[in-house]
């Protein structure tokens, strides 16, 4: 938009209004400290509680009332009186003087009209506002609207406030798009039924004048000073519309649709001066930001650095804590969707959603039906009767979700506390299955975690957690996977602390404990140390270190189970004493006391089992282990009650067992669960890669002072010192010192790696004898350790095929046990009556004892845990040796590897080509210069080698345009004089018959040809060195009977020479292979079309090891794709296994870990089958001379699960 077009048509008019140079004001406000701005506003309210006054009109007359000030403003608005009353000095505005920051009053240009819908008096703006139509609710941000991409809606105060010069009050507001892609036109803004219109009945001082002009909404309001607008913006792709938006915003030129032209005063000379000023201002800002857009590509980051509002569409901000800050500069909403009014400090009020603190709650249908509010706002200094009309939008529940503030999908991670077996996991999956908004679900019993993609248009996280809590007994908590977090200890109650003003960069607060707050923040805006030390108005301190959420959830659940078990033991001991003491067991008082204690155990300790079993039956249609516990313990307890009743009436039953059976049964079950949880928690924690993270760092400030700090307080820009033999706290670049670093625990590299200035160091590695000064490059939560741990966790969330088999067996196990129990009960009644000649009552009692024992001694959990516990340990063991399994299926099949296919360059070789011979024809300098211009910037190893070689010889690159790389073939471009330049593989360029090319190929070199207009100008012979462990790895793989292959896009001579050195058959190599040909070759092997007849008995398992982008298709096609870490990110994403260090012997590590893991899985299956078989036979009385007493059957879970966990843990100490 051209400046002259923007300001055309301006002239004199009867209606006049004031103009404020908002560029100067906004820069001054944005550069000011936020806390200082807020402090000033508080002081201003304390000194002047009169309302809005004009700086020149009213400040010099302190006794003026708000009504008098407003009356003068209306006189200016309607009669065009002396403009100096309003302080509208254009010269001051233009020169950036003090008056540019003074409060100014916007005059209105027509008389008030009554809005027919709400009955509110609204000042007309000489346009559509007079009709009371929809435009009265349209507005724009900072006087500028998104013309073709989106429109932002802003709720601002329409009230008058007294402020001193240069004081900028901070107004909180939210902006909400009505569609996920943003509003496409001003017609997308529509008015909705307001909640509690009583609060909006009076607009005497709160006038909001809105009209539209040239498809751009313009807004003006009665406002002393331009308020700083705070939004949370998500930068989008910036374009020229952003430049126009910023330029318009800087000018603060308010134009309205209609025939009435608006000027600064009634004087034509003043109008001309004003128009000239705004035109110049617009042009200056337009040119400035056009240049920034051209150079940086994104203006948002530049504005963010300056503390300014983004030029792109803002998004809604939310607080997921228990309450939002009363002083925070942002507004928040809860799931109720209702706007309420909440008292804050002083005489401020805030439109809020916290129904718990509401003075009133909206009862309109718009709030009861809508889950989302259109607009929230902070109103300063006035009561609800003075709040002007709220600009709201149409209900948008189909487009906007409270948790994310937009449509689309969001990746959610939930911690799940309370899962103990695969039955629990199956129940969780069924509960998720009832939710249409959940997709891509992954659950992990071992990690106690669930991940899924949430369709925000169909539900929120709160809805999901509410449904899960209703249908299952587990406890859920969302784990944040965005930004950074830090826990701090606050000096008073956490619920009060969240009402403190939030520093810039803080996005969310969450109450962890009574006086511990978890802060979510953007580390690029504010560092953790600054946040803790200087971010708050009250002193806070960093909280004690807590484990990763997945481990922390397990710890908390372990504590709960431990406390419950301890209580059960305490209550059971007196029962056992009274039952086993001969002098006490026959007394009614003793038995009555036992009954009371047993009842507490049955309904307090074992009570959750009842609820869990009922939820599983009702909501998930599952019969699980909890049902067996409920049936067995209930039978024992009811039998004891009945037996006690007979004893009281003087007809005791033959059995002497009373309440000790049910009580001891419950207690032993709890002991078994506690020990199992403890072993499982220790197992997971022991192989956690995050345990390698150091806990402290030595910070070096600008003066050289050294301070030891908690590692969580590191922030961008820090320099830390690494002492000899200490662990490196986080990733960084060495800026001073030299040493050798042991990276074995991170990369598996056994030899120390030399480090010097500009070397990269990674978190978790151990420094040698030297001292290093390192500049931080990655924060602890995003460093190498965290990245590796994330990939390992992803593998733990996947399930191998063998796990599906185990789950299927476990699902039939409980119904089978119930059937065996019924059969056992019936058989023992028959045996008691027919064989043992017992009375019917005695036969029934005996049958009940055997039935109870069968129910409780069996353990389906051992079958479900046999696979996942081993795979979790295996993935951790492999990670500590530099091998990252990205899926459990890779662990399952790697031990069956039958073929290993290698890419040559960068995989079998170092990937660092060197030029050994050069042939240049014609003008040598010109050819080399053109070639350097062509290859410079191309990331292919050959192009990089050529460019490096030419630069070392002092060649200067010529300008080459239209450069394009064709993967696996060539790179081409055009010289400044129009010459067609090509370089690359001689075969694809059609020069393989050139004598120089043939000579180089015969010698086994890789050949690079350079042609100009189709004629060969230069030929380069290159060679690459084998990796140090290539020969030994190939030999060991061959000894295991694995077939070896080489695929390469390189020349045939170089590939065959490499194969000969490694002893690989010529029939198993392919040269000049394109990515598609590599994929086809691997596919033939996988499908058995390229295998020996001896290997046709089972499907081949093919491992393809590559590093480049051109290997990505092959990595996907193979059974297992292995990526070398120094390769491209595309290849890394396509791979199933990632090698942290480019060492080929890691392939052997991968296969060995898989072999040992699968051996332990089979061993666990064997144990689970053996245990359940013999335990059930013993419990059912199959052995005449021996059977398990029912009170000791509760040890079954302990006896069955501990060996499984023990076998898995032994993998840590296996020789790999």
From Swiss-Prot:
Binding site for Cu cation: 421, 424
Transmembrane portions of the chain: 557-578, 593-612, 621-641, 660-680, 809-831, 848-865, 1162-1181, 1191-1209
Outcome (variant: residue 970 to G): Confers localization to the plasma membrane and cadmium transport function
Record's bilayer topology term: Multi-pass membrane protein
Annotated GO MF terms: ATP binding; ATP hydrolysis activity; copper ion binding; P-type cadmium transporter activity; proteasome binding
PROSITE patterns per UniProt: ATPASE_E1_E2, HMA_2
Physiological role: Cadmium transporting P-type ATPase which plays a critical role in cadmium resistance by extruding intracellular cadmium. Capable of high affinity copper ion binding, but not active copper ion transport. May play a role in copper resistance by chelating and sequestering copper ions.
Enzyme class, broadest EC rank: translocase
Name this protein carries in UniProt: P-type cation-transporting ATPase
Keywords: ATP-binding, Cadmium, Cadmium resistance, Cell membrane, Copper, Ion transport, Magnesium, Membrane, Metal-binding, Nucleotide-binding, Translocase, Transmembrane, Transmembrane helix, Transport, Ubl conjugation
GO BP annotations, alphabetical order: cadmium ion transport; detoxification of copper ion; intracellular monoatomic cation homeostasis; response to cadmium ion; transmembrane transport
Enzyme Commission (EC) number: 7.2.2.21
Active-site residue numbers: 903 (4-aspartylphosphate intermediate)
Annotated source species: Saccharomyces cerevisiae (strain ATCC 204508 / S288c)
Annotated family: Belongs to the cation transport ATPase (P-type) (TC 3.A.3) family. Type IB subfamily.
Keyword Cell membrane: yes
Intrachain disulfide bonds: none
């Amino acid at each position: 938009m051209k400046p002259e077009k923007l300001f055309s048509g301006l002239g004199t008019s009867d209606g006049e209004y004031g103009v404020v140079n908002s560029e100067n004001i906004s820069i001054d406000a944005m550069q000011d400290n936020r806390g200082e701005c807020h402090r000033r506003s508080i002081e201003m309210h304390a000194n002047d509680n009169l309302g809005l006054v004009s700086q020149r009109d009213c400040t010099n007359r302190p006794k003026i009332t708000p009504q008098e000030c407003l009356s003068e403003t209306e006189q200016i608005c309607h009669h065009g009186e002396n403009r100096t009353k309003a302080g509208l000095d254009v010269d001051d505005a233009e020169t950036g003087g003090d008056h540019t920051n003074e409060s100014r009053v916007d005059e209105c240009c027509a008389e008030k009209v009554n809005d027919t819908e709400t009955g509110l008096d609204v000042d007309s703006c000489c346009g559509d506002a007079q009709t009371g139509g929809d435009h009265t609710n349209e507005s724009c941000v900072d006087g500028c609207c998104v013309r073709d991409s989106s429109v932002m809606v802003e709720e601002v105060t329409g009230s008058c406030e007294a402020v001193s010069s240069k004081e900028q009050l901070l107004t909180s507001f939210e902006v909400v798009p009505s569609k996920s892609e943003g509003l496409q036109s001003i017609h997308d803004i529509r008015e909705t039924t307001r909640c509690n219109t009583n609060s909006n009945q009076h607009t005497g001082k709160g006038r909001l004048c809105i009209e539209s002009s040239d498809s751009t909404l313009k807004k003006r309001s009665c406002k002393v000073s331009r308020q700083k607008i705070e939004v949370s913006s998500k930068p989008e792709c910036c374009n020229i519309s952003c430049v126009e938006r910023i330029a318009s915003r800087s000018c603060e030129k308010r134009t309205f649709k209609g025939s009435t032209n608006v000027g600064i005063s009634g004087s034509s000379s003043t109008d001309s001066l004003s128009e000239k000023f705004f035109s110049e201002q617009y042009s200056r800002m337009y040119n400035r930001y056009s240049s920034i857009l051209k150079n940086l590509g994104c203006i948002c980051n530049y504005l963010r650095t300056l503390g300014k509002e983004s030029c792109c569409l803002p998004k809604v901000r939310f607080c997921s804590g228990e309450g939002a800050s009363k002083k925070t500069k942002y507004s928040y909403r809860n799931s109720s969707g209702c706007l309420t009014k909440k008292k804050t400090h002083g005489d401020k009020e805030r439109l809020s959603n916290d129904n718990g603190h509401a003075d009133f709650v909206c009862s309109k249908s718009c709030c009861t039906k809508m889950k989302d509010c259109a607009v929230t706002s902070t109103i300063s200094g006035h009561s609800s009767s003075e709040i002007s009309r709220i600009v709201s939008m149409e209900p948008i529940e189909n487009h906007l979700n409270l948790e994310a503030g937009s449509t689309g999908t969001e990746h959610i991670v939930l911690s799940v506390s309370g899962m103990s077996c695969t039955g629990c996991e199956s129940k969780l999956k069924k509960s998720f299955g009832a939710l249409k908004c959940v997709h891509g679900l992954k659950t992990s019993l071992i990690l106690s975690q669930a991940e899924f993609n949430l369709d925000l248009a169909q539900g929120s996280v709160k809805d999901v957690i509410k449904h899960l809590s209703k249908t299952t007994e587990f406890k859920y908590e969302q784990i944040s996977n965005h930004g950074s977090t830090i826990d701090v200890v606050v000096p008073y109650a956490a619920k009060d602390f969240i009402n403190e003003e939030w520093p810039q960069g803080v996005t969310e607060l969450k109450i962890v404990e009574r006086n511990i707050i978890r802060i979510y923040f953007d580390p690029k805006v504010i560092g953790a140390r600054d946040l803790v030390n200087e971010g708050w108005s009250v002193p806070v301190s960093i909280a004690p270190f807590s484990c990763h959420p997945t481990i922390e959830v397990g710890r908390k659940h372990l504590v709960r189970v431990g406390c419950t078990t301890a209580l059960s033991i305490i209550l059971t001991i007196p029962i056992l004493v009274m039952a086993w003491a001969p002098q006490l067991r026959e007394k009614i008082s003793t038995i009555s006391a036992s009954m009371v204690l047993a009842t507490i155990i049955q309904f307090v300790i074992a009570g959750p089992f009842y609820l869990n079993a009922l939820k599983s039956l009702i909501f998930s249609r599952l019969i699980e282990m909890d049902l067996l516990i409920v049936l067995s313990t209930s039978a024992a307890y009811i039998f004891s009650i009945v037996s006690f009743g007979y004893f009281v009436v003087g007809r005791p039953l033959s059995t002497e067992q009373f309440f000790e059976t049910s009580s001891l049964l419950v207690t032993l079950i709890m002991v078994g669960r506690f020990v199992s949880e403890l072993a499982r928690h220790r197992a997971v924690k022991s192989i956690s890669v995050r345990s390698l993270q150091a806990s402290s760092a030595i910070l070096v400030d600008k003066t050289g002072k050294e301070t030891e700090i908690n590692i969580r307080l590191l922030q961008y820009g820090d320099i830390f010192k690494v002492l000899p033999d200490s662990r490196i706290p986080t990733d960084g670049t060495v800026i001073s010192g030299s040493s050798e670093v042991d990276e074995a625990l991170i990369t598996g590299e056994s030899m120390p790696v030399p480090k010097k200035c500009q070397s990269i160091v990674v978190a978790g590695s151990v420094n040698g004898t030297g001292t290093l000064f390192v500049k931080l490059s990655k924060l602890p939560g995003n460093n190498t350790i965290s990245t590796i741990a994330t990939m390992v966790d992803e593998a733990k969330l996947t399930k191998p095929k063998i796990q599906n088999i185990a789950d299927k067996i476990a699902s039939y196990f409980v119904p089978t046990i119930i059937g065996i129990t019924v059969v056992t009960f019936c058989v023992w009644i028959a045996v008691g009556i027919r064989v043992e000649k017992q009375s019917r009552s005695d036969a029934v009692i005996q049958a009940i004892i055997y039935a109870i024992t069968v129910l409780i001694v069996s353990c389906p959990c051992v079958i479900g845990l046999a696979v996942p516990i081993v795979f979790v340990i295996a993935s951790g063991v492999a990670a500590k040796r530099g091998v990252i399994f990205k899926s459990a299926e890779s662990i399952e099949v790697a031990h069956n590897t039958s073929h290993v296919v290698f890419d040559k360059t960068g995989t079998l070789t170092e990937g660092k080509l060197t030029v050994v011979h050069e042939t240049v024809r014609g003008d040598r300098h010109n050819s080399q210069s053109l070639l350097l211009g062509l290859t410079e910037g191309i990331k292919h190893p050959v192009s990089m080698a050529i460019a490096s070689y030419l630069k070392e010889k002092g060649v200067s690159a010529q300008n080459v345009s239209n450069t394009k790389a064709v993967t696996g073939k060539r790179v081409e471009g055009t010289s400044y004089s129009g010459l067609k330049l090509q370089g690359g593989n001689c075969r694809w360029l059609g020069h393989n018959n050139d004598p120089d090319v043939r000579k180089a190929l015969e010698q086994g070199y890789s050949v690079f040809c350079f042609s100009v207009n189709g004629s060969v100008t230069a030929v380069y012979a290159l060679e690459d060195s084998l990796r140090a462990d290539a020969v030994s790895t190939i030999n060991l793989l061959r000894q295991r009977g694995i077939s070896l292959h080489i695929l390469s896009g390189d020349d045939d001579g170089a590939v065959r020479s490499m194969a000969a050195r490694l002893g690989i058959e010529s029939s198993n190599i392919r040269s000049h292979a394109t990515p598609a040909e590599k994929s086809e070759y691997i596919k033939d092997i996988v499908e058995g079309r390229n295998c020996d007849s001896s290997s046709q008995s089972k499907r081949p398992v093919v491992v393809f090891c590559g590093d480049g982008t051109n290997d990505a298709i092959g990595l996907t096609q193979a059974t297992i794709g292995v990526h070398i870490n120094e390769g491209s990110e595309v290849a890394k994403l396509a791979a199933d296994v990632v090698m942290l260090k480019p060492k080929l012997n890691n392939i052997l590590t991968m296969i060995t870990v898989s072999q040992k893991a699968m051996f332990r899985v089979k061993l666990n299956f064997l144990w689970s089958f053996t245990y359940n078989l013999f335990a059930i036979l013993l419990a059912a009385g199959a052995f005449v001379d021996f059977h398990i007493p029912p009170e000791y059957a509760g040890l079954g879970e302990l006896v069955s699960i501990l060996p499984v966990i023990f076998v898995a843990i032994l993998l840590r100490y296996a020789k790999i």
